[in-house]
């Protein structure tokens, strides 16, 4: 048996067990009556016990809980921001709709005012033309009256001058006395 391995022994091993691997037998080390897989299990139990004693799971869960709380707060904040953004969007949509209605109403009002101004301007211009026509007619009438008055005054002045001249030519002191006596007698 040239290929058969030699049994291994360690100084720490007090008990050596044999394992049958087919044709060859291997010796596995053991200490304090425990096999290697049992030592791994004991080490894991000790590690878990130390972790429990140092409260590592509560630290881990506390950290996870804090992280969960932060994420939840961020989600709540995001929901609040989204709700606020939607509210602002709806508000501005309503404002835009109102602004469009107001603009349309203002345009309609401006059209009505422009029409009213045009109608008033037409009426005012007609009234102005009528007033100016009447003023022109009044000026013409006044000029005619002034001309007639001037002609009358000129005629009266000419008649008075002619009367004076005639009276002066045909009327003497005797006629004046006679006329004065008649006027006095009538009184």
Swiss-Prot record:
Keywords: ATP synthesis, Cell inner membrane, Cell membrane, CF(0), Hydrogen ion transport, Ion transport, Membrane, Transmembrane, Transmembrane helix, Transport. GO terms for cellular component: plasma membrane; proton-transporting ATP synthase complex. It is found in: Cell inner membrane. It comes from the Bacteria. The keyword Cell membrane applies. Pfam families: ATP-synt_B (PF00430). The chain crosses the membrane at residues 36-53. It is a single-pass membrane protein. Coiled coil: none annotated. GO terms for molecular function: proton-transporting ATP synthase activity, rotational mechanism; proton-transporting ATPase activity, rotational mechanism. F-type ATPases have 2 components, F(1) - the catalytic core - and F(0) - the membrane proton channel. F(1) has five subunits: alpha(3), beta(3), gamma(1), delta(1), epsilon(1). F(0) has four main subunits: a(1), b(2) and c(10-14). The alpha and beta chains form an alternating ring which encloses part of the gamma chain. F(1) is attached to F(0) by a central stalk formed by the gamma and epsilon chains, while a peripheral stalk is formed by the delta and b chains. Belongs to the ATPase B chain family. F(1)F(0) ATP synthase produces ATP from ADP in the presence of a proton or sodium gradient. F-type ATPases consist of two structural domains, F(1) containing the extramembraneous catalytic core and F(0) containing the membrane proton channel, linked together by a central stalk and a peripheral stalk. During catalysis, ATP synthesis in the catalytic domain of F(1) is coupled via a rotary mechanism of the central stalk subunits to proton translocation. Component of the F(0) channel, it forms part of the peripheral stalk, linking F(1) to F(0). This is ATP synthase subunit b. It comes from Erythrobacter litoralis (strain HTCC2594). The gene is atpF.
